[in-house]
Amino acid sequence: FIQPLDSFRPSKTMPVVIYLHGNSSSREEGMQYVPLLLKHNINAFIFDFAGSGLSEGEYISLGYNEKDDLEIVINFLSNQPGVGRIGVWGRSMGAATAMMYIYKDNRIKASIIDSAFGDFKVLAKQLCKKVKNVPEFLVDVVYYFVKGSIKDRCKLDLDTLRPVDYAKLCQ
């Protein structure tokens, strides 16, 4: 949680932006934005999702379980003195996380959704198409087996990773 010293605070309460990093990244990704936020009298809360950076955990879930991390952070910030309005800034996986969570929490007053994927299955197929000479039926077969393996290991159905379904619920 990054905020100015009391002697530099323009008011007792200040808004805070929670930065949500992307896949294969960590809280370090968001540190570059701290000077910008503080310049505009906005506190910053930057953390590692479970399974990323210095956090415990073995796997990331591209937003599915990370939305639980976001809820914990919002609950924490809501009880901190000096915290005003709460905003969320997500990039890539962090943006997908935000989309899958913010619709149900009216404590979030603003959001920046940067480069979220809309549907994991569509994204996976698009990425596989970049590999030359791989027939589409083979992509479907591999996706089927990978999906089963992830469901067994992580209890996550990849077909439910569709942040686009939550976009229409956000206001």
Name the predicted role of every residue range.
Residues M100-L156, D165:
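Hydrolase active-site cap/lid region
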Residues V34-E56:
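Conserved alpha/beta-hydrolase
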Residues L5-V16:
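Proline/glycine-enriched tight loop/beta-turn segments at coil->beta junctions
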Residues E29, I60-P81:
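Alpha/beta-hydrolase active-site loop
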Residues L169-Q171:
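Short beta-strand/loop motif that positions the catalytic acidic residue
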Residues M14, I18, N23-L36, F49:
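The serine-hydrolase catalytic nucleophile loop
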Residues Q80-S92:
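Alpha/beta-hydrolase fold nucleophile elbow
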Residues G90-M100:
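Glycine-rich nucleophile elbow surrounding the catalytic serine of serine-hydrolase chemistry
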